Amino acid sequence: MATFDLRNTPSVTIPAPVQLRNVVRQFGRQRVIDGLDLDIAAGEFVALLGASGSGKTTLLRTLAGLDSIDSGELRVPVARAAVFQEPRLMPWKSAWKNVVLGLRVNDAKARAHAALTEVGLAHRLNAFPATLSGGEAQRVALARGLVREPKLLLLDEPFAALDALTRIRMHQLIIDLWRKHTPAVLLVTHDVDEAILLADRVIVLADGKIADDIRIDLPRQRDSGQAGFQLIRSRLLGLLGVKGAEPDTAPQASAPDSTFSELRRVASAR
């Protein structure tokens, strides 16, 4: 049997599952995405910030296959799923049937049960959407995405309509599921703190172009009182045009945000 010495074998570079090269999307004369270059690595969590009209949702829809591009090159995994601000559940179908909607497999109910168990809703398997809370409905939508075993998970402001405590619980759930399943994630959000708390990178989009791409090196589990958090926050707010923000000179927080920390403590205890 032949043997091989791999010590001097060059390492193989695995291409990023998401690659955009000079991508353009325009409506009439307006370029909503303007010559965009972007890579998202396997298992990487990226948050996308930007003012209204900056191109965030158009970019997400393009990656989801819901919109086309006018020019450039786009590479995305075939296995991808999207979760939107509205859960988009079929009201006449039970939770488990919503989870496997469009999925043609013999063990559909078993897969739905497994996915709902992962999001803490095994007991709501046969519940109808009208009986679900807002947080429960979003968890069903998340289970619907996970059951497809996506290599790319797209999140379009999925927590925007939730109360503060439910948002924090959903943040932790997303992180737990991301660590377990390791998809690449793109989160579109207007919430700067949310972006810093969850992402490996935060990209700021302006007029269809990347205004900044910031690596978040803060250790997890993150808190707004961590050294460096407020500096990153001020930089992002400055990029978003928030008056009074000083991206390069903002002081770091001297103490944790007590309200935020208390909410996280309560959420973790339940």
From Swiss-Prot:
It comes from Pseudomonas syringae pv. tomato (strain ATCC BAA-871 / DC3000). The gene is ssuB1. It is an enzyme of class 7 (translocase). Residues 18-232 form the ABC transporter domain. Belongs to the ABC transporter superfamily. Aliphatic sulfonates importer (TC 3.A.1.17.2) family. One of its GO terms (cellular component) is plasma membrane. It is a peripheral membrane protein. This is Aliphatic sulfonates import ATP-binding protein SsuB 1. The keyword ATP-binding applies. SMART domains: AAA. Gene3D superfamilies: P-loop containing nucleotide triphosphate hydrolases. Keywords: ATP-binding, Cell inner membrane, Cell membrane, Membrane, Nucleotide-binding, Translocase, Transport. It is found in: Cell inner membrane. Signal peptide: none annotated. Its EC number is 7.6.2.14. Residues 251-261 have a biased composition (Polar residues). The complex is composed of two ATP-binding proteins (SsuB), two transmembrane proteins (SsuC) and a solute-binding protein (SsuA). It catalyses: ATP + H2O + aliphatic sulfonate-[sulfonate-binding protein]Side 1 = ADP + phosphate + aliphatic sulfonateSide 2 + [sulfonate-binding protein]Side 1. One of its GO terms (molecular function) is ATP hydrolysis activity. Part of the ABC transporter complex SsuABC involved in aliphatic sulfonates import. Responsible for energy coupling to the transport system. ATP binds at residues 50-57. Residues 247-270 are annotated as: Disordered.
